[in-house]
Amino acid sequence: MKTVGIVIPIYNVEKYLRECLESVINQTYVNLEIILVNDGSTDENSLNIAKEYALKDKRITLFDKENGGLSSARNTGIEFFYKEYETHFSNEIDGFYTFTVANENPQNVYKIYKNKNTFIEKNLEAPDIDYLIFLDSDNSWELNCIEECVKRMQDIDILWFDHLCVYEKGIEDKGQKTRMQIFSYKEECIINPKDYAKRALEVGSRDISFSWGGMIDFNFLKKIKLKFVNYIINEDIHFGMILFASANKIYVLPKRLYKCLLRSNSISNHDKKVTKANISHYFKNIYEAFNEDAKSAKEYLRLASRVITVLKLIDFFQGKKENENSKAIKEIFLPFYAKKALKFKKVNKDPLNLKNELDKIKPFVKNILPYDAWKILQKIKNIFS
């Protein structure tokens, strides 16, 4: 039976966490290794709820760490499964054995909790897993999500499924389509990255982000040594583009197996309200550089994240031996994001000193049509087809 590793970042989600975790521990597929990563939550109960479930279900390992953002939390789980952590027993408390990271600790993990009844000896070792999947802690799965994925993962690098958007009260439902709907995949199929790039071109989309939208073959992920870029937003663009550029087979599963909650006080901040609560601890220096003007700091972070993302992608493509799949991904997607990154030149204050890096990006910008133009051309094409 294949083993599925699950990584769930947790940050101030006491209102949503139980529903999320119930959808995990009650999956019809049971051979799971569940990693909860408390990313420095400051609310009253997120960590306590995580501990409650870690005692309830022996498949759960709980990491408590410094606030570092979504990328850092996910990377904690990835690094654990990559077996990069050497752990030492710390103590026994409240039904747990606790451990610390004894070697390099890039995500600043404070403590690792595991139900003491799991152990014969006081040693915590990372399990071997076959597949990896992410879940955000304010979202949830259909109870057959993992089962539906696993039975399709044979010789597949990435499985991509559809999701259902659930709007929290006060958030406007604008009837937005999911990427699966935009790409018009209605039947299950296996594609390659070149096929994906071609379909993106046809529908006028440049969305290649990937994090919680499917399952990844773990040996494939480990082979390409991919992690998320820390301390940026929209981190799933970099992750997704490298993932797809490195893959051979992608399974398209147009089933809505994931429930995505759109709420205001989150990293993605779908209702565009910006408050001090949206600026996380790890953005503190930027926040202070803008005299605690949350709106300006968040706008700078948004633009800076684009630049950092594209610079990392350029490094990747320049260091990769090109094939027709990676070439298609690079040529269709990189110019679009490079062009967006160059909008950074309009910023007046630059605490990260990124303006000097823009010259590295300019050669990758081509004459590309804006997204609206692609939609218009597609409509014209449909009229005359």
Where are these regions (language model features)?
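Alpha-helical repeat scaffolds in large eukaryotic proteins
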Residues: Y82, I314-Q318, L342
